[in-house]
UniProtKB/Swiss-Prot annotation:
Residues 146-243 form the HD domain. The keyword Repressor does not apply. Residues 10-27, 66-75 have a biased composition (Low complexity). Gene3D superfamilies: 3.10.20.30, 3.30.70.260, Beta Polymerase, domain 2, Hypothetical protein af1432. This is GTP pyrophosphokinase.
């Protein structure tokens, strides 16, 4: 297996099924993270019609099994049992001929439990028949029959090793909501357990996840889970298949569902210990929300995989050799790397991709807990452990009952190696989580079936069964006993960028706040006026300072002032955590300190103009400011100045709009040369560098390339006569063309006529995963392409994405394509494109 993530394979029926009379399933293949589809669907991506179907037909019994000619009568004992078993399997195969599309699913079911009863398989087939009949005529967004979706979901459940009741519920999970097949009918046909599961999934589908999830929403999920955790397993399989087949939805809906998957379903799979599902959900959602970063990480992984695999093979061989010498039976494999986890480490830990991906991880699986610690000692005897990196999750399991030994050692060539050591049973739980309970039972039967029947088998002790259920019971008890859903909500992480705390009002209402919130945040969450007038607080009956940090379960009461002039303090902005409180405080000062903001706005405009050497008195006229204020949808000049002073509008943006209203910088200041800057920064009216443009019908005219759109040869252009009697050349699609067209008499026809001395301005934007020496590498590549960099601006966002903008001179615009290609080859760069320095939105 390659060292990359290997996802569950989706239900992909045999090709023969597509030609069968019954509708064939066309579920997408999950594959590895490179292969799976990046597009993605809603939870119910179907255009459903609701015809009234006939009642479902009962499956026909298998034909009687006739004894072949010459066949001796069955003898009693083991021989007769084997004959009956063969005939039973033959009957199942014959029965399956009615629905060949079911064969891939039933093949997995029989592999999980070779001794499964024929009647149980018939019940699964019956569930398919009922679902197919009630969904007949309904279509998914892809145009496929809707039955392909529940069939694919059920195949995922079968791969998880779920029991027959869960498989039947998977086939029927949409029947109650989308058809007239009622709960009473379902219970009559398939029993109370299947009815309970389908009803639970239907109720869970109605839970709406808002931006700030309420405690009641979380309680609904816990209640649904407490009744039977298989409800959530079905829901996760449902979401996984929808994520695999989301490309048929509109982009906006894809992103909405992908974000919901990252914030709700992937953390939920993590809470249930179902890491196999969690990893694939994260990678699929990551590919939809951040496609460029996803593609770049995929490319970087593919680039480094050969060397990493070579080093991994060396480490694996040495570990296996040492364990073999100690007579410890073990399986040693490379640990998968998942694209979203790589991305998260880049963001959260601020580490370079090379540092993350080159850290090799291996997994050691053994038979017993004693062997786990023996293997740990063996590894530490060969390589020195890194202090502080050992974790014993066997003695102290995680919240989802994850158990393993974690250690990091200094491996060959001085490189760190991460190891996870656990038993096979622990690994099963780590991969499948809550689903491992059912998978464990199925695999135990499968192993038993391979033992010779004439050899006595040890009886499974009563305590073994109780211990097997203890993990499931402990997880459910933990959920039931958590009256305050804060801890559960923290695990779901409705906002991945922060944790939350839950506090109570004096009336016992629950208020959700960011971690580290204060009584001031609480006050603004209750009401804006309560926040503005807050003067003190009491937490759990004790007076506390307003900057005190609140914890889960705190009972908070605030005191307010009735004075007419009561208001917030600017100091509060230094410790409040919630966006609501911060925005409300700023809004108050925006209203109450209007004069101060207006003065700050005026000063900001003046500073921006002085920085560009622009004539302030000429530009800042009353008419121009009033016109601009109205264009920006402010009632007057004071309002626009206040907006600038408060930081709502950039001063540079306002100055640029004022200059453009006067016809550009060349019109605003005739003394400032607006031609493309030469290396000597000449201020002469005629630069030595020819702009390479001629005006039709006019000779000896001063021609300049407009900086607002920086046209280059080959692009459609127009000329505009400025107030300085020069001709400013713009691209035909320039953002300023609309305003220029208001004076058609000043527009001239121009055309390109570049000469050897022509030089053009080009601005490009580079987007990359942030790392050390990134700027150095990009500028080196630009220098190698023989372009003259005039300016560079770099900023890094909180998600560790570096955005760089470079402005440079070049003589041949055809060379731009080579420049962009060279920059795109820099490690970590996932997008580079030309930009125009037009007005900022």
């Amino acid at each position: 297996m390659p060292d990359e993530a290997q996802h569950l394979t989706a239900a992909k029926p045999d090709s023969a099924a597509g030609a069968a009379a019954e509708p064939a399933a066309h579920a997408q293949d999950g594959g590895g993270p490179v292969e799976h589809d990046r597009s993605a669907p809603a939870d119910k991506p179907a255009e459903r019609t609701r015809p009234k179907p006939a009642p479902p037909e009962r499956p026909r019994p298998p034909p009687p099994r006739a004894r072949a000619a010459g066949q001796p009568a069955a003898r009693s004992g083991g021989s007769s049992n084997r004959v009956r078993a063969r005939l039973a399997r033959l009957g199942v195969q014959r029965a399956n001929l009615t629905h060949p599309v079911l064969e891939p699913l039933l093949r997995i079911v029989r592999a999980n439990d070779p001794k499964i009863e024929t009647s149980t398989l018939r019940q699964i087939e019956k569930a398919y028949q009922v679902a197919e009949r009630w969904h007949r005529g309904q279509k998914r967004k892809s145009g496929d029959p809707y039955i392909t979706h529940p069939l694919a979901v059920t195949t995922i459940l079968a791969e998880l090793g779920m029991d027959p009741a869960t498989l039947m519920a998977g086939l029927l999970h949409d029947s109650r909501e989308d058809t007239e097949y009622g709960l009473d009918d379902l219970r009559r046909d398939f029993g109370d357990v299947v009815g309970l599961l389908v009803d639970g999934v239907t109720k869970l589908d109605k839970v709406k996840f808002g931006e700030a999830a309420q405690a009641e929403t979380v309680r609904k999920m816990v209640v649904a889970m407490a009744k039977d955790p298989r409800v959530l397993v079905i829901k996760l399989a449902d979401r996984l298949h929808n994520m695999r087949t989301m490309r048929y939805l509109k982009r906006e809906k894809q992103e909405k569902k992908a974000r919901e998957t990252l914030e709700i379903y992937a953390p939920l799979a993590h809470r249930l210990g179902m890491n196999t599902i969690k990893w694939e959900l994260e990678d699929l959602a990551f590919a939809i929300l951040y496609p460029k970063m996803y593609d770049e990480i995929v490319r970087l992984v593919a680039e480094r995989a050969p060397k990493r695999d070579e080093y991994l093979a060396i480490v694996t061989d040495e570990v296996q050799s040492d364990l073999r010498a100690r007579r410890i039976k073990a399986t040693v494999t490379g640990r998968p790397k998942h694209y979203y986890s790589v991305y998260q480490k880049i963001i959260v830990r601020g580490r370079d991709f090379a540092e993350i991906y080159d850290l090799v991880g291996i997994r050691v699986l053994v038979d017993t807990v004693r062997d786990c610690y023996a293997a740990l000692g063996t590894v530490h005897a060969r390589w020195n452990p890194v202090p502080g990196r050992f974790k014993d999750y066997i003695a102290m399991p995680k919240f989802n009952m994850y158990q393993s030994l974690h250690t990091t050692v200094i491996g060959p060539n001085g490189k760190p190696v991460e190891l996870q050591i656990r038993t096979f049973d622990m690994h099963r739980r780590a991969e499948y989580g809550i689903a491992a309970h059912w998978k464990y039972k199925q695999e135990a039967v499968a192993r038993a079936s391979k033992v010779r029947t004439d050899v006595p088998k040890p009886a499974k002790g009563k305590d073994d069964h109780l211990n097997d259920m203890a993990w499931l019971r402990q997880l459910l008890d933990w959920q039931k006993e958590t009256e305050d859903p804060g801890e559960f909500l923290e695990s779901l992480r409705f906002d991945l960028s922060r944790n939350e705390v839950f506090v109570f009002t004096p009336k016992s209402d629950v208020i959700a706040l960011p971690a580290g919130a204060t009584p001031v945040d609480f006050a603004y969450a209750v009401h804006t006026e309560v926040g503005h007038r807050t003067i003190g607080a009491r937490v759990n009956g004790r007076l506390v300072p307003l900057e005190s940090t609140l914890d889960n379960g705190d009972l908070v009461e605030v005191f307010t002032s009735k004075a007419a002039g009561a208001g917030p303090s600017r100091d509060w902005l230094g410790f409040v955590k919630s966006p609501r409180a911060r925005n409300k405080i700023r809004a108050w000062f925006s209203k109450e300190r209007r004069d101060e903001a207006i003065e700050q706005g005026k000063d900001a405009i003046a500073r921006a103009m002085r920085k560009q050497n622009l004539p302030i008195q000429r530009i800042l006229t009353g008419d121009s400011l009033v016109t601009l204020a109205h264009e920006m949808r402010y009632p007057d000049i004071s309002s626009s100045d206040a907006a600038i002073g408060e930081g709502h509008v950039g001063a540079q943006n306002v100055v640029q709009k004022l200059v453009q209203a006067l016809g550009g910088e060349e019109a605003a200041s005739e003394e400032i040369d607006e031609a493309v800057p030469s290396r000597s920064r000449s201020r002469k009216r005629r630069s030595n560098q020819d702009p390479g443009v001629v005006v039709k019908g006019v000779d000896d005219v001063w021609v300049k390339l407009a900086r607002c759109c920086t046209p280059v040869p080959g692009e459609p252009i127009i000329g505009f006569v400025t107030r300085g009697s020069a001709v400013s050349v713009h691209r035909s699609d320039c953002v300023n063309v609309e305003s220029l067209a208001r004076e058609p008499e000043r527009i001239l026809e121009v055309e390109w006529a570049p000469t050897q001395s022509s030089v053009f301005l080009v601005a490009i934007q580079v987007e990359a995963l942030d790392r050390s020496r990134l700027l150095s590498d990009v500028t080196r590549v630009l220098s190698d392409q023989h372009v003259n960099i005039l300016s560079a601006a770099v900023q890094t966002s909180r998600d560790r994405v570096a955005t760089s903008r470079f402005t440079f001179e070049m003589g041949d615009p055809k060379h731009l394509g080579h420049v962009l290609k060279a920059v795109r080859g820099v490690e970590g760069v996932y997008d580079v494109y030309r930009v125009t320095p037009g007005p900022q939105p």
